[in-house]
Amino acid sequence: IGSHTVAIKTKTPQPIMPAMMGIMSITSPNTQEAKGERNPQGTGPYVFGKWTPGQSVTLKRFSGYWGSTPVVEDVMYVFRKESAVRAAMVKTGEADIAPNIAVQDATDPKMDFSYFNSETARLRIDMSQKPLDDIRLRKAMNLAIDLDALRGTIFAAGVVPQTQIVVPSINGHNPRLKPWPYNLAEAKKLVAAAKADGVDVGKEIVIIGRLGIYPNSTEAMEAMHAMLSEAGFNLKIKMMETAGWLNFLSRPYAEDRGPTLVQGQHDNNNGDAVFSMYNKYACEGAQSTTCDSQVEAGIKAATAATGDKRRDTWQEVQRRLHQDIVPDVQMFHMVGFSRVNPRIDFTPSIATNSQLQVSQVKFN
């Protein structure tokens, strides 16, 4: 329309367009061709300095930034896989902020912060593959997991058993749903009933884990492997780096993949369930293995609705998924831990696991 005006048209109604625009990055389409893949250009308060793959990234404050001038002039992101190492670097003054450290490393109340981080952990069940297309087995998996045994040990004591992919603060969360109880005897009965009907319950199921997806991620899969095995399932674990794991998480799925449970963690702090539901549970969702006509219709209706109707429609979709479809082994709404050097004025929040805005950081 003009040099500073853009017209946006959508194929379907988008009542929360302002919220959706708030998570979009703005980048020139000419950036990659002109500057290369490793010299990103954006509209933020910092400019890209240097990238040493697998080691570090540096940023410098942008003097021409259109907004308020941030306090921090230079930034270095250093990558260390081990939580204990990251925590120790802050303690010794080698680093200032270590986001997402493990619960066992958060031992200093003067430096460590605990907070709900908007992440929801689950195992996605590949419902398209036998024997996981049998709902009795999907229910049995949920009944076989002793969530209380995982809390305060492998996971932080403050994690909350989940009933849906979005946290309670998100519009569309259904507060009336109850977490699956731990009932090993009932889980075994469901497995036995499926076996009696000719379901191949002994077929090997592969747990696809991602290294470092959250603290103690490997230990979590090992514990859940033991619990599911006790219920009568035949499983093995494959822990992968992110690139290999993504081949199982997102389309296109390999036709010969077999039955899998994919370790996942989903972050939605954008205020509405729409940012989660299509991708995870629609028939054509990028990470969906389910296709239910009622869920599909509900997602479409809720996306176009406003007010109470929008909330209520999302809540019914959540109910059907939780009670009638069972596409996940449900785990927790997660708690994060971050360590902050006392010289830094910064309080981690629900957003810290997915982004750390240096413009918010000040010095004491």
Spell out what each predicted region is.
Residues S83-E94, I135-R136, E222-A231, G244-G258:
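Short helices/loops that flank or line small-molecule/ion binding pockets
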Residues S3, Q14-D74, E82-V85:
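Gly/Pro-rich hinge or "lid" segments in bacterial periplasmic/extracellular proteins
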Residues P13-I26, T43, R124, R339-Q357:
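A structural "hinge/loop" feature
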Residues V6-I8, G44-V47, V57-T58, E73-V78, ...:
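Short, well-ordered beta-strand elements
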Residues G49-K60, M76-Q129, G152, V159:
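Extracellular/periplasmic solute-recognition and catalytic clefts
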Residues T52, A144-G172, P215-H225, S250-N364:
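Detector for C-terminal structural segments
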Residues L132, P161-A194, L211-A220:
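Structural transition elements
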Residues K60-S63, Y115-A140, A144, T153, ...:
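A bilobed periplasmic-binding-protein/Venus flytrap-type ligand-binding module shared by bacterial periplasmic
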